[in-house]
From Swiss-Prot:
Residues at which 4-CDP-2-C-methyl-D-erythritol 2-phosphate binds: 23-25, 149-152
Cited CDD domains: MECDP_synthase
Cofactor(s) listed in the protein's UniProt record: a divalent metal cation
Sites annotated Transition state stabilizer: 52, 150
Protein name per UniProt: 2-C-methyl-D-erythritol 2,4-cyclodiphosphate synthase
Classification of source organism: Bacteria, Pseudomonadati, Chlamydiota, Chlamydiia, Chlamydiales
Reported function: Involved in the biosynthesis of isopentenyl diphosphate (IPP) and dimethylallyl diphosphate (DMAPP), two major building blocks of isoprenoid compounds. Catalyzes the conversion of 4-diphosphocytidyl-2-C-methyl-D-erythritol 2-phosphate (CDP-ME2P) to 2-C-methyl-D-erythritol 2,4-cyclodiphosphate (ME-CPP) with a corresponding release of cytidine 5-monophosphate (CMP).
Pathway(s) per entry: Isoprenoid biosynthesis; isopentenyl diphosphate biosynthesis via DXP pathway; isopentenyl diphosphate from 1-deoxy-D-xylulose 5-phosphate: step 4/6
């Protein structure tokens, strides 16, 4: 008997979708006045990123994870339009647009973030970053996990040339 074809089985009310996103940027020179922003949190004493936007790789990775579920390209399409027509470089605005692309029966239930970079020092601001992500995604703080690694000098990120982020999102979709 094939369970998929058995109409006597109850239809699940929720299905789970998993989105994955990645982003990375190189640092600007040390003399740059552009701030280093990660998850909407400013890291003093670290240069900003080479990017048309504020370069927030964490919010960008989350946008890409949402796009992997919604099939609506935010970075490269929506964000570029916002930048070129309205001058918007704030990645939190791009993230808001990504969230709007979710269907009305979809909601983010968990975010797992991993960051690789030799600088800045992530640990002192991990709590603020988690709070910022939870607020932006409208999910409980306990539903946001962040890990960070220095990279031990094994990649450009580990050597301090930039920072890389991966994001996995769990998205619940009601189908009842």
């Amino acid at each position: 008997m094939n369970a998929e074809n058995d109409s006597s089985l109850p239809k699940p009310q929720w299905i789970y979708r998993v989105g994955i996103g990645q982003d990375s940027h190189r640092f600007l020179s040390e003399s740059s006045a552009k701030p280093c922003i990660l998850a909407g949190v400013i890291f003093e004493n670290s240069p900003g990123f080479q990017a048309n936007s504020d370069g927030d790789i964490i919010f960008h990775a989350i946008c890409n994870a949402i796009s992997s579920v919604t099939h609506r390209i935010i970075l490269g399409e929506v964000a570029d339009e916002l930048l070129h027509t309205r001058g918007i470089t704030d990645s939190s605005v791009y993230l808001s647009e990504a969230i709007k692309s979710l269907k009305s029966n979809q909601m983010i239930s968990h975010a797992a973030i991993t960051i690789e970079g030799n600088r800045p020092k992530f640990l002192p601001k991990l709590s603020a970053m988690r709070q910022s992500i939870a607020s932006a995604l409208n999910i409980p703080l306990g539903s946001v996990g962040i890990t960070a690694t220095s990279g031990e000098g094994l990649s450009d990120f580990g050597c301090g040339d930039g920072v890389q982020c991966f994001c996995i999102l769990t998205i619940m979709e009601y189908c009842g």
